[in-house]
Amino acid sequence: MTYLVWAAVFAMFVVVLLGYFLGCLNGSVLVSHFIIRDDVRQHDSGNAGLTNFYRTYGARYALLVIACDMLKAVAAVSLAAWLGARFDPRMLPDLPLTAAEQAEYVLHFKYWAGFFCVVGHMFPCTAKFRGGKGILCSATLTLLLDWRIALVCWSLFAVLWL
């Protein structure tokens, strides 16, 4: 029985690390460093987010940042779903998990990877824990995890912000 618990803990730990380190890949820092050859954190508000990047460099490069931030969220959730679909803590090929049990593992893995992807975006260990605000990453994750919740959240955001 303890093996089953430790297998689940280890698998969740791998998913959490995967989500966090994918989140640490901040799109605005990567684009400003490798394409523009500058550091976005040295300008305007000093934040490594999309808003500061847009204010500093304009819309042309901001689309690359949007793509990077959305792709890292998609990658974190997709890899977590892939790992969750292959995860069976019992290691019994004769008695596989039911579809409901497997779907529950996949859902839990996706939520944990997504949450830690946002945490990695906001507090990246690669940038002295100074990251973005996590808005675009969170919006992408809500769309990936449940489109109905994303629709409600985005509508409220549009009404309150605009």
Regions found by a protein language model. Name each.
Residues 10-36:
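N-terminal signal-anchor transmembrane alpha helix
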Residues 4-6, 51-56, 102-104, 130:
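Helix-boundary and loop/linker segments of multi-pass membrane transporters
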Residues 54-58, 116, 120, 134-162:
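Interfacial segments of multi-pass membrane proteins
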Residues 11, 15, 61-65, 71-126, ...:
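Nucleotide and nucleotide-moiety/phosphate-recognizing core
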Residues 24-30, 129-137:
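Transmembrane helix boundary and interhelical junction motifs in multipass membrane proteins
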Residues 1-11:
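N-terminal membrane topogenic signal
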Residues 29-62, 131:
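Cytosolic, membrane-interface loops and tails of multi-pass inner-membrane proteins
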